[in-house]
Regions:
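Low-complexity, flexible helical/coil segments
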Residues: 79-88, 112-119, 159-164, 238-245, ...
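Acidic, Ser/Thr-rich peripheral helices and adjacent loops at domain boundaries
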Residues: 94-103, 263-284, 353-364, 383
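Metallocofactor- and cofactor-centric catalytic cores in central/energy metabolism, strongly enriched
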Residues: 2-205, 211-219, 225-230, 432-443
């Protein structure tokens, strides 16, 4: 029986990766720039919080959304993914934020795909054939409500011909949540039908998840532990995006949990209704389309990985395909900012992955590499490429300085030392003594 499961390494789609000079005019992902902005390039940032890894910020019910809101007010364009922006029945529209599914974000970072901002998508809805009638009706009412009250372009829905049979578990090696669907073919057939019948170019999927015992989700409701649903949600959306190259996001269907008075605010968004679908439909309605990086995508003014100026991610979650691609890019390398306060169950720190990180904090940090024990003597401070910060307050401050063309170290006491002299290497076949003689003859000292 065919199954879909989450792997660390995923097969790449054979796409054209022709490189082109980045001299074209950048497209805006929000309102037209004012006259004062015409003389500068737009600043683009990427915010990543991996799914199902117990992130201190972003590991619950949309609790990274305030960070995205604050960051979007500083940058011209913010690229992030559903785990950051989805908050069940809550959402926050931000005109300069691009809602990009995780698999697509990885391909974008690797330079394989480009992002094409849109005014509107045609959204289709896939409902798991295993959803009970009453629960299905409630989700259809959500779709109608978003169409009538928000004007969202949700065109048609389809029910899978076979129940998907979602399974979820925690990976014993990494501690992150993951899972599979037993009948991936049923999901792909449903999506293909919507694409061919209704010409949709974005898909929301609602899978029937097993109802948890209260004991299994008690830690999560108290604001600790991991999201048991998130890992397999990523499996589902990855499958659709990999197969059809269109925006996709998932919303689980479950019966409401019993009421509890002792609830962490970070988990509360998932307790206020029968559905997680509103934020998904809202995000997909204007999610960018995914195009292979080629001459056509360049002519359409799409965003490329080389357009990204900075990337923000948790301090010990740096091993994802997208994070590594950005950190190891050879051309137009973005500023990588890791946030110490946002811990996960992973142990993928920059130093373990060979990602050179500058220490921006003035206190002891357990993630600080040994060779960066002193802020003032760090040799990398003259050319900032990766920065470790204490929290998202500092991250946003660093990005504001970076966007303004200001060395962030100039904002700290003793952050700037004396300028250092660079010595040229002797040319091949010419001794240092000969070079000195030539300089003296030319009158240059």
């Amino acid at each position: 029986m065919a199954t879909a499961t989450l792997h660390n390494s995923r097969p790449s789609i054979p796409l054209t990766t022709t490189s082109r000079s980045s001299t074209r005019r950048r497209i805006s992902c929000f309102a037209p720039p004012s006259c004062s902005n015409k003389c500068r390039r737009e600043y683009t940032s990427v915010m990543i919080v991996p799914t199902g890894v117990g992130a201190s910020i972003g590991g619950f019910a949309g609790d990274a959304l305030p960070v995205a809101r604050a960051l979007s007010s500083v940058v011209d364009c913010l690229i992030t993914h559903p785990n950051v922006l989805n908050a069940a029945m809550l959402y926050w529209p931000m005109p300069n934020v691009l809602y990009v599914e995780g698999y697509a974000l990885d391909r974008f970072a690797q330079g394989l795909w480009a992002l094409q901002p849109v005014h509107q998508n045609k959204v289709g809805l896939v409902l798991d054939g295993g959803i009970e009638e009453e629960l299905r009706i409630r989700h259809l009412q959500v779709a109608d409500a978003t169409r009538a009250s928000l004007g969202l372009p949700v065109l048609e829905y389809i029910v899978t011909d076979t129940p998907l049979e979602v399974e979820k578990w925690v990976d014993s090696k990494t501690g992150q949540s993951t899972g599979r669907i037993k009948h991936p073919g049923a999901l792909l057939r449903a999506v293909e039908t919507l694409i061919n019948r209704s010409q949709v170019n974005a898909v929301a999927v609602v899978g029937r998840f097993p109802d948890d015992d209260v004991e299994d989700v008690d830690d999560y409701r108290q604001g600790v532990g991991i999201d048991l649903l998130a890992g397999v949600e990523a499996v589902i959306s990855h499958l659709v995006v990999r197969e059809f190259q269109i925006p996709c996001a998932h919303a689980p269907a479950m019966l409401p949990l019993l009421l509890t008075k002792d609830l962490c605010p970070r988990s509360a968004a998932e307790e206020i209704g029968y559905t997680f679908l509103p934020c998904v439909l809202t995000g997909l309605s204007k999610a960018p389309q995914y195009l292979a990086k080629d001459s056509q995508s360049l002519e359409k003014g799409c965003l490329l990985a080389s357009d990204v100026d900075s990337v923000v991610l948790p301090v010990n979650a740096c091993a994802g395909d997208g994070a590594l691609a950005f950190a190891r890019s050879k051309r137009n390398k973005p500023l990588i900012i890791t946030v110490e306060e946002n811990e996960t169950v992973l142990d993928d720190t920059p130093d373990k992955l060979g990602i050179e990180t500058v220490w921006l904090m003035n206190y002891d940090c357990k993630y600080t590499p040994r060779n960066y024990g002193c802020f003032r003597t760090c040799n990398a401070m003259q050319s900032v490429v990766q920065v470790m910060v204490a929290n998202y307050w500092e991250a946003i401050g660093v990005i504001a300085a970076h966007k303004a063309g200001i060395n962030p170290y100039s904002l700290r006491r003793n952050g700037i030392g004396n300028i250092k002299r660079a010595f040229a290497k002797p040319a091949k076949g010419v001794s240092s003594a000969t070079q000195t003689t030539l300089l003296e003859m030319s009158g240059v000292h």
